[in-house]
Structure formats: C-alpha cells, structure tokens
C-alpha cells in the first residue's frame, strides 16, 4: 500500500494580479481536531496562510483545512484572491521531492470556483477585515456551517466564479439557492420566520 505523505507545515501565498493587498493585517489561532493545529493569516502586499502542527499529519488533511480557511476568507473579501504557491515542509517521514510533487498536485487540482468572476472584484479592497473577526470559535462554527450547507455552498461559489458558465445558468443557480439558504438562516436566527417553502408544480 502506498504511503500517505505527511508533514508538519503548509504555507500558501496569495497575490492579487490587479492590486497590492493592503496591510499589515495578521491573525493567529489554534484549533483542536484529531490533532492540534496553529493557523496564522498575514497580509501586507501579499497574503500568507500558515498551518502548522507539532506532529506529522497527512498533507491531504492540511490541504482540506487550508481550503476551508480560504473559503471563509472569501466571505470577507467578496472574491477569491489568486493562489500563487503552496509550500509543504517539515516532514519526518518523506523527502522534499515527494512534498514538492504533492504541492504540484494540489495546485493543478484546484477547482474552477476558486477563480472569481470579474463582477466580484469590486474597486473596494475588501468587504470586511479578517483580522478583527476570525477566531478559533468562528472557524469552528464555519466548519459546522459548511457541513450543513454541503452542495449549496459549492453551487454558490460556482455561480460567482469565472468557470465559463453562461450568466443565465449562474442566475438560475442563485435563484435555486434562495430556499435552502432561507431555511438555514431560519434555523439559526429569527430572520425570515414567516417564510415557508411554496408548493412545487
């Protein structure tokens, strides 16, 4: 059986092709899953997300955690920022060549919704400042919400992406997402309490 590559660190570098990212902004927090992780997000001209663990963990677990953080940051920015590179390091079990091959695999396997459509790139630099909002508690709530949203969130991201879908398809997706989103909002807040799903014919 092929050995799963493991390491202790993932660093992702983002650069905006059209403007310098403002800063300095920085936030750090720790989360406990099966293993403990420390996350740092720094921004000044570029953005850097660093995820570290005290022990070797699967590179796929590191990348999955990174992807969830990236999607959370997208809510604050209003669009995805271009990912320039992923760096995997600090492994006690595999050499750098294997880690480099994993880096290439992750970069080539990026889904198309990580490239936001032009209409998402507003002239303002961001919608919300991540450094004043993100905490370990907020991230844990985000993980739970992602599980609850499931395919709804992915459809939303594809509707805002530069994926080649026509505008009418994107609009149809967004309209279809209204009902499940309202149900989730009703479940967690007092908003839209009077709305009920209509009969489908």
List the predicted regions and their residue ranges:
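Charged, non-catalytic interaction/linker regions at domain boundaries
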Residues: 1-153, 161-165
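Amphipathic alpha-helical interface elements
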Residues: 145-201
